[in-house]
Amino acid sequence: MTSKIQNPNLAALSAAGVSVWLDDLSRDRLQSGNLQKLIDTKSVVGVTTNPSIFQKAFANGHAYDAQIAELAKRGANVDVTVRTVTTDDVRHACDVLACEWEASHGKDGRVSIEVDPRLAHDTDKTIAQAVELWRIVDHPNLFIKIPATKAGLPAITAVLAEGISVNVTLIFSVQRHREVIDAYLAGIEKAAEAGRDLSKIVSVASFFVSRVDTEIDKRLEKLGSEQALALRGQAGVANARLAYAAYQKAFEGGQRYQTLMARGAQVQRPLWASTGVKNPDYADTLYVTELVAPNTVNTMPETTIDAVADHGVIRGDTISGTTLSSQKVFDSLVAVGVDLIDVFAVLEHEGVQKFVKSWNELLKETQEQLDSVAK
């Protein structure tokens, strides 16, 4: 029986209004009881997955071999095999997190599964697959992850209108975050027109943090001036803080949301993603301790959860009151010559391509396993 004594640092983070989610899932993690242990001792109340996470899970060890062999004997093709295996893991994780879902009235206890990343620029196919995944997993604490591409935005609205909960992923800019909020509100308005229970439709907006620093720092180093170099390591946090200000404007003061709230609609919480620190010169808890505010989620790899548990200093709300200083960071970036429009375009393109590459590798490796069973 796992002890249910929560780590004090992570408990403090939760008490400050930040839901701690694990950015990882594998069958080994489920079967070993590790996910349950993280729930019981590290305040974890949700799970996010993506194509890269599943590709690594399949590649490491043999936890999936027996199921893939069984599917091969039944004549399943590679797409069906991958979808069956991944949705089984997600369904199992939904069961593990059911208590957290109930205790939070549906806000937490969520498990995210992403639509095929190859559909990132196809609205209709994204909608169709989102509906299919929702049907296959068939758990109310599921999130369907849809990327915040231009084609993804109308898909988000359409899927929410069907009463399906959505995790919007690959958001890099505050402007795109505003468009995501609009897509969410439009979807909830359509759901209201259809007579759906708005309190049951939940969404988060996954705003990527460390990748912004990685891309902008690279450009600052290329520029090389003293002013440029002094700005390294500031953009990721400042960008996320400005995204939180956009959230506050829409949901804490926006009339459009107030009308929907009266009918039971929930806010679309910002979720800080890509919070594992990639630069060893920066504190390994940077994207956690500097992004504390009510009604947020931080999804972290286990190494980051462990770092916060060990030495993360939670100082309460570190976002409120930072809008002007955060905007100043971006004004300074423009002043030294950083092309922010290009930065965010590159990040979105690379984000989609990384997931496509992982998905293709997953399909290739699974096809090889299917072929070996057939021989």
Swiss-Prot record:
| EC assignment | 2.2.1.2
Reactions catalysed, semicolon-separated, are:
D-sedoheptulose 7-phosphate + D-glyceraldehyde 3-phosphate = D-erythrose 4-phosphate + beta-D-fructose 6-phosphate
Keywords in alphabetical order: Cytoplasm, Pentose shunt, Schiff base, Transferase
Broadest EC class assigned to this enzyme: transferase
Primary localization class, coarse: cytoplasm
Q: Name one GO cellular component term.
A: cytoplasm
Compartmental location: Cytoplasm
Which InterPro entries does this chain map to?
Answer: Aldolase_TIM (IPR013785), TAL/FSA (IPR001585), Transaldolase_2 (IPR004732), Transaldolase_AS (IPR018225)
The entry sums up its family as follows: Belongs to the transaldolase family. Type 2 subfamily.
Among HAMAP family, the record links this protein to: Transaldolase_2 (MF_00493)
Protein purpose: Transaldolase is important for the balance of metabolites in the pentose-phosphate pathway.
Name the chain's protein.
Transaldolase
